[in-house]
Amino acid sequence: MRRGKFPGSLTDRQDVVVTLPLALPFKPMLAKLSRELPAGDGWSYEPKWDGFRCIVFRDGDGVELASRKERPFTRYFPELLDPLRASLPDRCVIDGEIVIPDREGRGLDFDALLQRIHPAESRVRRLASETPASFVAFDVLALGDDVVLERPFAERRSLLADAVRPTPPVYVTPASTSAAVAADWFGRFEGAGLDGVVAKRLDDPYVPDKRVMIKVKHERTADCVVAGYRIHKDGQGVGSLLLGLYDDSGGLQHVGVAAAFTRAFRTELLTELEPSTHDAVEGHPWQDWVEWQASNEPGRRPGNVSRWNAGKDLSWVPIRAERVAEVSFGQLEGGRFRHGVSFRRWRPDREPADCRYDQLDVADPVAFGDVIGAAAEGG
């Protein structure tokens, strides 16, 4: 029987010894990106939840939540602890996702989820009440003294369905062996803020830290104004481009960044954009952000300290807002692109003033409950 210690918990105790057969450090199984859903026999499909990946360790009254990167989540989501005790077996390890349903019934609210990672306990408690989270289970890793990683997914899915007593805010994700149902989910549930669809082979074991599953994500393109950039963390070249879209009032809204460039392209971008930095501050659409950065005053700005890494430099270099880039993105939420945005090409044939929100094709809202209710559909 493996014994281990949980890192930090809601009470900041470091001596919580677990008798589960699995303990931290533990890295979850991952998914590799595909442009098409795999078809044929032997596959199971699930909605791809857009939240925080979370491994739940329950040992009697002890419940600990661990992130994909093995960081403790427990103190940030105290409202989940009692529901998890009520819904999960006494001793188990469950893989799933923490999400926050929008209270107005428009799907998931990822921005509200981001706000939950905060160092002040008073704010943690307040947000737990104002924007309560849910947990969606989609795999089981251990039950009692048994590690079930080597068992095929079809068997693990059956164990999960029998083990979890779904009661809000704890759920079991819908699943189907029908590719037609999965294709329907892919299109229909985008409006709920879901990323796409995940496919798992019914005979696959659970392989920690390996890309065994298949994920198919939504992708669209947009023309955006490039209004600044950040230097790469190694100090060599451009690490990311700051993107903007004009709203109906004529304001240029910061909608995200394009990044993940090759080393050669980072250097090329720095050389190409350097002339655009000249006289860029005066009249810049984000001049107030530039001035805030120069004064180093605290506040929520593009140059603020990262919530995830206090040592991360988010300072940026303004350029004249004259360049247009075509980018690919997955989702738009709260007026901003979600997750990574990919640079495709420069568009010298486009005018910055034409880079508006109304060019975007946005999915109609779908309620969180409609997604959960899909479990009753074809299997």
Residue ranges and their predicted role:
Residues M1-G379:
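Catalytic cores of nucleic-acid ligases and guanylyltransferases
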